[in-house]
Amino acid sequence: MSKKSNKNLAFSLLGLMMSMVLLSFASVPIYNLFCKVTGYGGTTIKETVSVYSKVKGTKAIIIEFDANVDPNLPWHFIPRQKRVQIVPGQNTLVFYEAENLSNKDIIGTSIYNVTPNKAGKYFVKIHCFCFEEQLLKAREKVLMPVTFYIDNDFERDPEMENIKVITLSYSFFKIREL
């Protein structure tokens, strides 16, 4: 091989490596955008104007809460409640707890989904920590609120007839240390 072809190969490999690093940092925001646009993976609806339903449903639904943390993020993250029982149209406030176990300030972001996936279109979030990146100072512990309701149309959808339990799951990922 000539020096010119070795140089071209080196630049090509360097460019490929840089592209992979950039893509790894952009993957969570790109995934969130993809899910919001397509409704993929049980993505919920974000209420842009807080319209609180005055009409409440009659079918009791259990909402279970799940929390996961990427191994690269030294946080402890748990739901404060394991489950709640609600009816469609009932506004509900729950909390997750996050603690930064490191000696550094860290910014994290979360992705979420609802299972079963087909119930995601009826899960409406009014307020959620997942709408923004979260900064936790070194050794800081915080409560993170989520306010939501299940849309009343849930009861009228024949596909939801056998749904008794819905799981809201969050996964936190590290953005950067400060």
Curated annotation (Swiss-Prot):
Residues 36-178 are periplasmic. Residues 1-10 are cytoplasmic. It is found in: Cell inner membrane. It comes from the Bacteria. The chain crosses the membrane at residues 11-35. GO terms for biological process: respiratory chain complex IV assembly. InterPro entries: CtaG/Cox11_dom_sf, Cyt_c_oxidase_assmbl_CtaG. One of its GO terms (molecular function) is copper ion binding. GO terms for cellular component: plasma membrane. Disulfide bonds: none annotated. NCBIfam families: PRK05089.1. HAMAP family: CtaG. This is Cytochrome c oxidase assembly protein CtaG. It comes from Rickettsia prowazekii (strain Madrid E).
